[in-house]
């Protein structure tokens, strides 16, 4: 099934998985729980979380775009040179905070 079909699925678990499936999406949501972050800050946080393995700009951009399209995060561009972009959780994204905390508890203290 394609993602649009999965988003229309009657099962909420299938819909949730269609929205957050991806190598970094849950981690991005976790990083944004404390407030807005710039693109580069998110990239560094993900690199730190993966033991120094860098995330490619293409992959990070794709994950951020998909989270934005699914309205879990918002993107705000500020005028100026160089352009500055910040991402933050939307109300829908903030609603996942409890789920993310439960995942961290399940994963144990080393996961936080």
Regions found by a protein language model. Give the residues of each.
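N-terminal helix-turn-helix DNA-binding core of bacterial DNA-binding proteins
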Residues: 11-59
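Canonical helix-turn-helix DNA-binding module
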Residues: 47-82
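Alpha-helical linker/hinge and terminal dimerization helices associated
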Residues: 70, 99-111
């Amino acid at each position: 099934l394609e993602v649009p079909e999965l988003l229309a699925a009657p099962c909420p678990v299938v819909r949730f998985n269609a929205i957050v499936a991806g190598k970094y999406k849950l981690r991005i949501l976790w990083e944004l729980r404390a407030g807005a972050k710039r693109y580069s800050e998110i990239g560094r946080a993900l690199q730190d979380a993966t033991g120094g393995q860098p995330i490619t700009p293409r992959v990070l951009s794709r994950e951020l775009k998909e989270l934005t399209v699914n309205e879990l995060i918002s993107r705000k561009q500020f005028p100026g040179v160089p352009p500055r972009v910040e991402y933050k959780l939307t109300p829908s994204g903030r609603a996942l905070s409890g789920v993310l905390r439960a995942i961290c508890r399940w994963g144990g203290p080393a996961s936080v």
